[in-house]
Amino acid sequence: MIRKSKKITKMRGSRTCGYGEAKKHRGAGHRGGRGNAGHQKHKWLSVCKFNPDYFGKYGFNRNPGLIKQLETINIGELEEYILKYKDAFQVEDGKVVVDATEIGFEKVLGKGRISTAMVVKAVEFSEGAKEKIEAAGGEFVEL
């Protein structure tokens, strides 16, 4: 077993126990404060050198009232919904009439495949959704 004497035992009788002058081991005064203290005062040069972007604001946050959060549904999911609940939708001229806002969606996106001709009413459509609806023989109506 290793028997190593502790540092404090070796330092007995040395007055300062390896901390230099007696004043240097009191509180945080020898360091100029604890942690980030003094970074805008006496430690400013070290901030400029090592962390220049620490202070100040950058960028901006958009006003949440200006951001549109639309509920979306893909065109493939919409067709599955129509096939699942056939009785809930009207058929005019061989096309199923779907109002996306009535089922809780504002925007129709273009992911998926459709084979049903339908008239889709929504607030917004993506370009892909418009193309797929027209390719299936349907039409879209923006509200």
UniProtKB/Swiss-Prot annotation:
Keywords, ordered alphabetically: Ribonucleoprotein, Ribosomal protein, RNA-binding, rRNA-binding
Keyword Transmembrane helix (UniProt): no
Q: Name one GO cellular component term.
A: cytosolic large ribosomal subunit
Region annotated Disordered, chain positions: 1-38
Where composition is biased (Basic residues), the residues are 1-13, 23-38
Could you provide one GO biological process annotation from this protein's UniProt record?
translation
Gene Ontology MF term list: rRNA binding; structural constituent of ribosome
SUPFAM superfamilies documented for this protein: Ribosomal proteins L15p and L18e
Its biological purpose is as follows: Binds to the 23S rRNA.
HAMAP family, per database record: Ribosomal_uL15
Q: Which family does it belong to?
A: Belongs to the universal ribosomal protein uL15 family.
Oligomeric form and interacting partners: Part of the 50S ribosomal subunit.
Protein name, UniProt field: Large ribosomal subunit protein uL15
Q: Which gene encodes it?
A: rpl15
